[in-house]
Amino acid sequence: MMKAWNFILLGLMVCSGIFAQPAENQIVITTNHPLVKIEKDIYGHFSEHLGRCIYDGIWVGEDSRIPNTRGIRNDIVKALKDIGIPNLRWPGGCFAETYHWKDGIGPKESRPAIVNTFWGGVTEDNSFGTHEFMDLVEMLGCDAFICGNLGSGTVQEMAEWVEYLTSDAKSPMTDLRKKNGRDEPWKVKYFGLGNENWACGGNMDPDFYYDQIKRYQTFTNLHGRNKIVNVACGPAGDDYNWTEVMMKPHGPRPYLPFDALGLHYYTFIQSVAVDNDEWGWFSTFRDNYN
């Protein structure tokens, strides 16, 4: 008898499921009351002297048969404008920690060459420098993110670069900028206080790096009306100790010597920076899409 009642109960449940009417649901979307704002600058891009990103990639020179504007490839400008990049970072990356900006200004035929020690050991002629990069940024209508050389450079070198870029006062650096063809200062939104200083930027520990950026930051905000966002080097992956040290004010003055922290996370492949073979390309795609 119990089995019969169980069968009847099961039948009633099945029938009720068949004849039940679906409930009407409504979704209300209020477009004028956003909950959060996604900062556009997290979608910024990076241009480093790595492989053919700069030479042959962005820069081909004024005499190239590839269509260009003042040496910068027109197709690259169009592609980057089409995706609407908010900011562009240059010259690195690890390359920034060997780059001395004064070698990349003035007449191109007078610029000294540089050996790209981090990426392939190739020799570059420095024909793409500060003026060329800022020209590119203005073509794109995006913000400039300059990365300074904290690893092998000096405080004075970095401070003079900021002055050259942004100052409107009468000074040796602004006179030099005008001599090189740019009367008005540029607008620079972001300035990196080194790059990956736990590795290629000097193999520093976080306490030492923190002390270094206190000196550098002191002298990079002194010029013109351009308020620069100083970006410090963040951790390698999940190195929480680096972050803890960076976010804790040191010494008698309780302030952080930076405005933002750069984060670094990579998918590594066993390949080379230039002249990648077919396997290198497929490995890159596979590791980044998995």
For the regions a protein language model found, what residue spans apply to each?
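N-terminal signal peptide c-region/cleavage motif recognized by signal peptidases
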Residues: 15-17
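Non-catalytic accessory regions flanking glycosidase/transglycosidase catalytic cores in CAZymes
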Residues: 20-244, 248-260, 286-290
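Extended catalytic-interface subdomain
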Residues: 256-268, 274-289
